[in-house]
């Protein structure tokens, strides 16, 4: 089983490098887009979304809370919010990371935290970006 923790996004180590492999993620994903560049795993309380570029390089991993679901099969990838990031308000995050918001986003190195109604909506991890700009942020509904 692969475990992704919030703290993984904020360390030099990052997430398990095996999850950079599109072929592996395809074998554990619950759903995927038509072109298979967007793959998602639905764990009990979180959706874990992997976005790959056309050359199969991991572009980002996105985590968002979902309505708790009943597990129909054993899961192979899990997200643990060990920083309770999804329980924090916009002001909590600004204070914790000493950052300001731009267009409902706070960026910290390879991480972009997106807010809706001053609550954390989603957490993005861009493994190959030294720093994120808002032009790199795409919603999950964006065409590939």
Predicted regions and their residues:
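Short helix/turn-capping signatures at newly exposed starts of structured segments
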Residues: 1-109, 114-144
